[in-house]
């Protein structure tokens, strides 16, 4: 089984590093310099870039601060390091001086003349401005723990939470018995998705907020007054404080009297820093602040750092609203934060997004320092914009932003908020009427943001894109774009607003030559062929890109590219295919994925090279060509994956050791081609071109015979691409899954990521499910079916939610989920709508109340038939895994639901409905809110048996269960090319046995990732994950453990507590800890990963086979042989269920189980299992195979040992009439109790053989580096050739 464990030990299989994509390999000769010169220059540059230490001299104290700095750093980074240091936390408004001269914050360290190791920089306090005073107040409040909880419309409840510290900290001294025991059949425990409740944090001060006297009147502003604050200390004293340009002082104000002058001595108190002032005002402040710091330091720092450059993950399951984890506390300053962050006029938060994007893009990128600064600025800018767009979209969806065209239809309305242009992802003006209307428009927006992301990643000089974000929220799709200068300008008579591409549909086509060079570069990178299109007058225009892609010359003189939803051709094979009756696809926007086009281009390139080699006679036709074809076939899928790994925005969490092996074989095949080419001059592939025409099959009508012939060829090329997808890519994926060459996806997200990497559109889920029927990938079929059902529910729910007011959405969601998942508890659910809300929203669409389980199923079945051309089997709704399906639909809709024991089926009497909330009859009488809550709570605590009337029949879900809905955001943020180049260079160096250089480059890549993205970001989590594997291969286990721990925490906070990436990171952490010797802690993390697996997938996921094997091996390392045996047995059960009994997988597991039984001193069963293993190996692999011979050798040894045990047993039975049972009965087979009764004697009878057996197993495990645990993933590897 492909699993995390395999990814951690590729070195054992002779694969030291993952494949380095050929595109990243540096040329041998750069700018005419030799390799030696480059090395010398690099060494000199490295010496110049060596970090050194400077001393910071602090004011008003004798303490100094030593800070390591790099010549590449900017001064403001040193400022940040000072602010974060414990002895300098009180400073925020200051500048640095060197030799008496002020240093500019935005220059590099190397630009400061004379600044070297040991130099002293003086920290000089600056006068405050109003903005600086506000920033200082916000920072001090957060620093001392005085800021309360924030209600966030975008991030959701408990956003960015981590449970890592609870896994071990919860019970650090747990007895080994608790670690060993595990209930394999227990249902998923959702409690593991919630952090443990802790007591309230110690308060260093009661409150600190803006005073009612704020803001200062004009007279006092002239005197330097900036803000007025009111502070209440733990001693119960209240102080009014003036924030002055020179610092903070206690004034004479009271709640009734305004007098902002300083208090006279001896009650006067003043300081430049508010933190220092608090120490003077409150005698207990320092002590309580220390306690607060100790409380905060209980968690890993990464678990508490602010999530900066990405939207934190919002868990789908959250605690009850009464939980202390989400308790809403009084905080006067919460409502003042808008002012504190944005100022009195709120101008601080108003930004010209488009100008910022394009100005950042135009920054120089000649040097490494330039690129670091540019990419860091872009990463921050994209993150800020995405966050602002998401917030604006939520307000638009809730109807809180006035439209610019209020008289238009709702779907056609447009909005501007916070300098971002918003529109709905619907066909409000009829643009997509011929393509499928609203459905086509919705898909086009998703494809557009993907196209913008690709263009941003390509980073073509002189070509600009607007900031683009797509937000799905409560059934609405909203597009947020930065405002391109001139986009709203009405064109002059005879002019077109669009300068390149289609204008007014396709009636007019513009082809401004100023756009041709930039579009040519873009087309080359995207594999788009230059082609002809015709306008309504049949006039020919030669375009570099799709006619749908538009070029606009902004009033700022920049060339903008818009409407990137058609960068690839249509999937004509899908459109022409006739599915089941009634399965007409809802739109014509069925484009191929860019990953597929790129993979096909690589395949065509390889075929071209092979043909050239054949033409030159370098390779022969029969044998060699056949082998080449095999290598090509082997490499097809991997090429897709390699290229997509470079372009995909998703973390590479599903990559495994088997994938890396496939990559290596691909690389070998490519190197053979290259070496062969060198024998007879280098093959010039510049003459080979592969590009597709994206406008075929879209209504273009060629005029001449030559044009018709060219169009026919273009159409054939696109058909070949469709054939490649269906006949090569999809079968290759299924074959890789069958052979366990890649990990099985765990849920909808990982399935989507896997298919997209391979270039497979999600509309092929039905085809994949059909092809998987009755094969060894049955669980893959089940996952495909689950994903289709979840997507169908999402689409049906969106239709009811789209035009519903926000307060009614909880009732709608509860009713739809009761019909979908709760019909087993109540087959006729009734929607519970608050009658007060019904009166308020009397014109709302209450059609969701008419939904029944039956018509909901029918609607979902139609969605699946239309979108996936797949027919669900009868009774599919009775086979649903309720928890897993609830998780899937919650994540797709952005729902955050309360944690409680949801009853999905009616039992004979009692427990499940206890947690449920009964539904009141409709219409229900209006009651006092508190009384209503009490009545509902009482009803939950009674048995459903007594609830005879319809009004008290329990429902699985009630509106109160839905805590929040968060927006689902798709952004266009590019990845850092610089950080990835350093990573690939480090991998390449290690692959070439330049370990020291490789490690330096890897550390440099890590530093770049952290600098550019910040510490808490999905890309950084992936970097930690990759680096932990590489360090493990290099034998640096401590570093591998630390990095994998960081990867797990950051993944939890950015991609989800129960994401597949998080599971993988915990499995790696477990394995690395075990290899380091911390098996007990390793077992805790492995158990957590398995518990997450149950929540995500349910029982019996194929990859858990390897994980259970690893767990068993860890148990053996702590001498828990009997418990280890149980894990091997469970692993074998799952393997037999997934792959069948007569397979190499099962034979390998039987081999390992036999060893475990021998260690558990169950000699007879050990012999039986080893014999089964031997017979399967012999049948499948032949008697001469190494696996077969090894199994035969062990069978002989175990048989000899069993005979000795049997003799000892007979002697004991003769001496004693009654044997004491040493262990509880094990497997229910004949003679088990007898064997159990003589375990103590067995050791004495054949002590030498058992000791050898233990030694053999443990040494084998150590020598193979965990190879034994990987058996199930590819058992052929155990003996080499299979």
Swiss-Prot record:
Its main location: cytoplasm. Residues 1-50, 624-680, 913-945, 1257-1282 are annotated as: Disordered. TPR repeats lie at residues 1021-1054, 1063-1096, 1105-1138. GO terms for cellular component: cytoplasm. One of its GO terms (biological process) is mitochondrion organization. Residues 624-661, 668-680 have a biased composition (Basic and acidic residues). Belongs to the CLU family. mRNA-binding protein involved in proper cytoplasmic distribution of mitochondria. This is Clustered mitochondria protein homolog.
């Amino acid at each position: 089984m492909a699993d995390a464990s395999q990814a951690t030990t590729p070195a054992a299989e002779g694969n030291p590093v993952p494949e380095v994509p050929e595109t990243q390999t540096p040329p041998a000769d750069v700018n005419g310099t030799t390799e030696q010169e480059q090395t010398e220059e690099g060494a000199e540059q490295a010496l110049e870039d060596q970090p050194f230490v400077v001393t910071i001299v602090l004011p008003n104290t004798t303490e100094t601060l030593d800070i390591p700095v790099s010549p590449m750093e900017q001064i403001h980074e040193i400022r940040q390091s000072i602010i974060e240091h414990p002895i300098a936390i009180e400073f925020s408004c200051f500048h640095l001086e060197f030799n008496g001269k002020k240093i500019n914050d935005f220059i590099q360290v190397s630009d400061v003349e004379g600044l070297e190791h040991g130099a002293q920089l003086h920290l000089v306090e600056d006068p405050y401005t109003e903005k600086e005073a506000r920033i200082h107040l916000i920072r001090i409040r957060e620093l001392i723990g005085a800021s309360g909880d924030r209600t966030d419309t975008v991030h959701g409840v408990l956003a960015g939470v981590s449970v890592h510290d609870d896994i071990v900290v919860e019970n650090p001294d747990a007895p080994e018995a608790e670690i060993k025991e595990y209930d394999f059949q227990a249902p998923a425990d959702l409690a593991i998705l919630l952090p443990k409740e802790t007591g309230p944090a110690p308060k260093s001060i009661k409150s600190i907020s803006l005073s009612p006297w704020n803001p200062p009147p004009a007279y006092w502003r002239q005197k330097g007054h900036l803000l007025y604050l009111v502070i209440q200390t733990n001693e119960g004293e209240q102080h009014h404080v003036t924030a002055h340009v020179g610092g903070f002082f206690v004034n004479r104000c009271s709640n009734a009297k305004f007098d902002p002058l300083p208090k006279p001595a001896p009650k006067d108190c003043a300081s430049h820093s508010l933190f220092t002032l608090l120490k003077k005002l409150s005698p207990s402040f320092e002590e309580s602040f220390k306690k607060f710091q100790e409380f905060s330091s209980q968690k890993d720092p990464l678990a508490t750092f602010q999530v900066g450059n990405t939207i934190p993950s919002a868990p789908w399951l959250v605690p009850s609203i009464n939980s202390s984890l989400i308790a809403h506390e009084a905080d006067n300053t919460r409502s003042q934060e808008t002012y504190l962050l944005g100022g009195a006029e709120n101008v601080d938060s108003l930004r010209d997004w488009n100008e910022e994007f394009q100005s950042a893009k135009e920054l120089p990128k000649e040097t490494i320092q330039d690129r670091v600064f540019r990419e860091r600025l872009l990463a921050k800018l994209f993150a800020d914009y995405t966050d602002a767009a998401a917030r604006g979209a939520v307000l638009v969806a809730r109807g809180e932003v006035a439209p610019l065209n209020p008289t238009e239809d709702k779907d056609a309305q447009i909005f501007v908020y916070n300098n971002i242009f918003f529109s709905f992802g619907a066909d409000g003006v009829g643009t997509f009427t011929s393509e499928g209307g609203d459905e086509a428009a919705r898909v086009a927006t998703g494809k557009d943001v993907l196209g913008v992301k690709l263009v941003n990643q390509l980073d073509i000089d002189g070509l600009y894109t607007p900031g683009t974000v797509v937000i799905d929220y409560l059934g609405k799709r909203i597009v947020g774009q930065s405002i391109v200068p001139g986009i709203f300008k009405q064109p002059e008579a005879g002019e077109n607003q669009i300068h390149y591409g289609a204008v007014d549909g396709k009636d007019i086509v513009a082809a401004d030559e100023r756009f041709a060079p930039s579009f040519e570069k873009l087309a080359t990178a995207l594999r788009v062929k230059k082609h002809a299109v015709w306008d309504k007058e049949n006039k020919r225009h030669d375009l570099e890109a799709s006619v749908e892609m538009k070029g606009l010359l902004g009033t700022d003189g920049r060339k903008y590219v818009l409407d990137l939803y058609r960068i690839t051709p249509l999937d004509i094979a899908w459109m022409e295919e006739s599915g089941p009756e009634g399965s007409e696809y809802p739109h014509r926007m069925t484009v191929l994925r860019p990953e597929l086009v790129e993979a096909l281009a690589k395949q065509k390139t390889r075929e071209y090279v092979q043909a050239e080699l054949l033409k030159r006679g370098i390779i022969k036709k029969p044998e060699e060509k056949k082998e080449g074809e095999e290598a090509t076939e082997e490499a097809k899928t991997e090429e897709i994956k390699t290229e997509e790994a470079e372009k995909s925005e998703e973390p590479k969490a599903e990559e495994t050791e088997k994938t890396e092996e496939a990559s290596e074989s691909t690389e070998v095949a490519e190197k053979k081609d290259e070496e062969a080419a060198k024998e007879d001059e280098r093959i010039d592939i510049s003459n080979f071109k592969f590009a597709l025409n994206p406008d075929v099959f879209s209504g273009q009508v060629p005029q001449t015979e030559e044009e018709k012939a060219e169009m026919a060829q273009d159409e054939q090329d696109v058909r070949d691409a469709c054939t490649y997808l269906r006949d090569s890519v999809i079968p290759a994926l299924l074959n890789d899954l069958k052979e366990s060459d890649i990990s099985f996806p765990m849920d909808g997200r990982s399935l989507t990521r896997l298919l997209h990497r391979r270039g497979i559109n999600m509309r092929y889920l039905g085809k994949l499910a059909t092809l998987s029927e009755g094969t060894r990938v049955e669980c893959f079929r089940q996952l495909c079916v689950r994903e289709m059902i979840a997507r169908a529910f999402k689409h049906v729910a969106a239709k009811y939610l789209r035009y519903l007011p926000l307060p009614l959405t909880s009732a709608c969601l509860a009713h739809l989920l009761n019909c979908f998942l709760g019909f087993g508890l109540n087959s006729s659910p009734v929607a519970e709508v608050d009658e007060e809300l019904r009166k308020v929203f009397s014109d709302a669409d209450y059609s969701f109340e008419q939904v029944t389980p039956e018509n909901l199923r029918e609607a979902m079945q139609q969605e699946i038939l239309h979108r996936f051309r797949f027919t669900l089997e009868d009774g599919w709704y009775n086979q649903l895994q309720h928890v897993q399906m609830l998780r899937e639909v919650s994540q797709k809709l952005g729902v955050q639901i309360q944690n409680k024991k949801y009853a999905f089926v009616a039992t004979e009497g009692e427990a499940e409905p206890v947690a449920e909330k009964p539904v009141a009859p409709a219409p229900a009488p209006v009651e006092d809110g508190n009384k209503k809550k009490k009545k509902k709570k009482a009803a939950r605590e009674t048995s459903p048996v007594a609830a005879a009337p319809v009004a008290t029949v329990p429902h699985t879900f009630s509106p109160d269960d839905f805590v929040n809905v968060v927006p689902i955001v798709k952004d266009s943020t590019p990845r850092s090319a610089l950080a990835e180049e350093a990573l690939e260079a480090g991998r390449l160096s290690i692959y070439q046995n330049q370990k020291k250089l490789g490690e330096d480059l890897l550390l440099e890549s890590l530093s770049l990732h952290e600098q550019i993205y910040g510490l808490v970001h999905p890309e950084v989590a992936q970097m930690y994950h990759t680096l932990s594997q590489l360090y493990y291969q290099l034998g640096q286990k401590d570093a591998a453990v630390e990095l994998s721990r960081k990867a797990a925490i950051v993944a939890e906070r950015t991609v989800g507590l129960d994401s597949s990436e998080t599971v993988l990171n915990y499995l790696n952490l477990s394995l690395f800890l075990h290899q380091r010797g911390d098996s007990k802690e390793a077992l805790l993390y492995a158990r957590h990963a398995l518990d997450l697996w149950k929540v995500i997938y349910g029982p019996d996921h194929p990859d858990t086979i390897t994980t259970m094997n690893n767990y068993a091996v860890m148990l053996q390392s702590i001498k828990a042989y009997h418990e280890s045996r149980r894990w091997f047995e469970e692993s074998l059960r799952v393997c037999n269920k997934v792959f069948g009994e007569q397979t190499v997988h099962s034979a390998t597991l039987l081999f390992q189980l036999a060893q475990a039984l021998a260690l558990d001193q169950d000699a007879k069963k050990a012999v039986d299992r080893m014999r089964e293993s031997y017979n399967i190996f012999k049948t499948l692999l032949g008697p001469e195979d190494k696996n077969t011979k090894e199994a035969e050798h062990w069978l002989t040894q175990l048989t000899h040992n069993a005979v000795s045990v049997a003799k000892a047993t007979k002697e004991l039975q003769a001496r004693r009439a009654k044997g004491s049972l040493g262990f509880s009965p094990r497997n229910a087979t004949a003679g088990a109790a007898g064997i159990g009764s003589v375990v103590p004697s067995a050791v004495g009878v054949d002590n030498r053989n058992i000791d050898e057996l233990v030694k053999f197993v443990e040494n084998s495990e150590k020598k193979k580096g965990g190879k034994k645990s990987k058996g199930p993933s590819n058992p052929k590897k155990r003996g080499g050739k299979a």
